[in-house]
Amino acid sequence: MSTRTIETPIGLLTLQADEAAVTAIRFGADGAQDVSPLLDAAEAQLREYFAGTRRTFDLPLAPRGTAFQQRVWAALRAIPYGETRTYGELAAAIGSPSASRAVGMANHHNPIPIVIPCHRVIGANGTLTGMPAGWRLSESCWRSRGSPF
């Protein structure tokens, strides 16, 4: 595993990759600065995204999770930049219309936030809900800069 911490407009992010794919993005630092072409690409694409010059990512990803979580995370990647979906809409999109709470849990456990855009899912009442504390802080900073998700 290779790990690198980068500074971004929403705070420090730690990127993790194996030999073939990005496996995690975490809020905060672990101090590692490993050399890796894949981490170079991930860092460059994240910088472009935060600068507003990139709307999609073309990185190889390998999030670890259950088959259900994998389906949710694949559906998250299909939500276009600047758009949102409710948990119920996402549940219906994966063929499990009564599983909005389970979708919320999969969203909460997304190991590669930003690239797998869990921030584009909102509650039925239109509010951001169910996100980890670190993301909530970063999301409010991001919104204060006027950036769409």
Language model features with spans:
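…primarily DNA-binding HTH/wHTH and HhH modules…
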Residues: 124-149
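Active-site and channel-lining beta-strand-loop segments
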Residues: 13, 121-123
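Helix-turn-helix DNA-binding helix
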Residues: 100-103
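Short Lys/Arg-enriched helix C-cap and helix-to-coil transition segments
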Residues: 114-121
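Basic nucleic-acid-binding alpha-helical/helix-turn surface characteristic of O6-alkylguanine DNA
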Residues: 1-98, 146-149
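Terminal helix-turn-helix DNA-binding modules in bacterial transcription factors
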Residues: 109-113
